[in-house]
Amino acid sequence: MKIRGFEVVTKYKNAGINIPKRSTEHSAGYDIEAAETVSFAPGEIKLIPTGLKAYMQAGEVLYMYDRSSNPRKKGLVLINSVGVIDKDYYNNPDNEGHMFMQMRNFTDEEVVIEKGERVVQGVFMPFLVADGDENQEKEERTGGFGSTGA
C-alpha cells in the first residue's frame, strides 16, 4: 500500500523527471525540480511545472517551501510564500494533480530556471481541523491549480 510520495504525471512520463528526494539524512524537505526550462522577464510571475503529483493519507498535506538560496542566488521568490498541496489534489480531473511552483523574478534582469534545477522543497505534514469542522458542508474538488478559491 502506498502511504505518501510522488509520481510523474502522464504528460511528463518520458521527460526524464526525477522523483524528489531528501538531500541528507536529517533533511525535512524533498527537493523538487523544474520539469522544463523557464525564463522570467524582470518582475514577471510564472508557473514552473514540476511534472509531478503527490499522494498522501487523509489528515496530511504537502507544503512546498522556497529554497533559501533562490532569492539571493536567482532573484526568484515563491510568490505565494508556501504552496499547499491537498490530498484531494492528487489525480484531480482538471490536471491529474500536476504541481506547479509560482515564482516571481524580483530583479531587473532575465532569470532562467533550467530543467532539472531544484526550486522548492516539499514537506509532508499532518494537519489539524477546528472544532465543528465535521459539521460543515464540504465541496468536492473538481479542478486543479487554484480551484478551491474564488
Curated annotation (Swiss-Prot):
GO terms for molecular function: dUTP diphosphatase activity; magnesium ion binding. This enzyme is involved in nucleotide metabolism: it produces dUMP, the immediate precursor of thymidine nucleotides and it decreases the intracellular concentration of dUTP so that uracil cannot be incorporated into DNA. Pathway: Pyrimidine metabolism; dUMP biosynthesis; dUMP from dCTP (dUTP route): step 2/2. It comes from Lactococcus lactis subsp. lactis (strain IL1403) (Streptococcus lactis). Its cofactor is Mg(2+). This is Deoxyuridine 5'-triphosphate nucleotidohydrolase. It catalyses: dUTP + H2O = dUMP + diphosphate + H(+). It is an enzyme of class 3 (hydrolase). The gene is dut.
